[in-house]
């Protein structure tokens, strides 16, 4: 199956409560606001989603919450990247990918791999 995602997508912020927990009420409001505003797809844990500061469970919780609120209304893109290839593969192998239409994956940025290293990263 080929998915043609085009148009205006928004890399969603992840709202946090005062104590540092995820603000799920704020996330609900944001998700509905973006959908009602007429965008074409949502990007969860993209460039502005604070994924570098969140643990795996928090990332899964945010994704599951947005999937529930979105309810299939728009395509969903999930940001999935980092510098530690082995940790990414291990951490996300049991992730619930149902309802995710595409993955946005950044190349490792801190350790600056060679072209072959980048290829191996995505191959994994």
Please state what every model-predicted region is.
Residues 2-124:
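Active-site beta->alpha loop and helix N-cap motifs at the rims of alpha/beta catalytic domains
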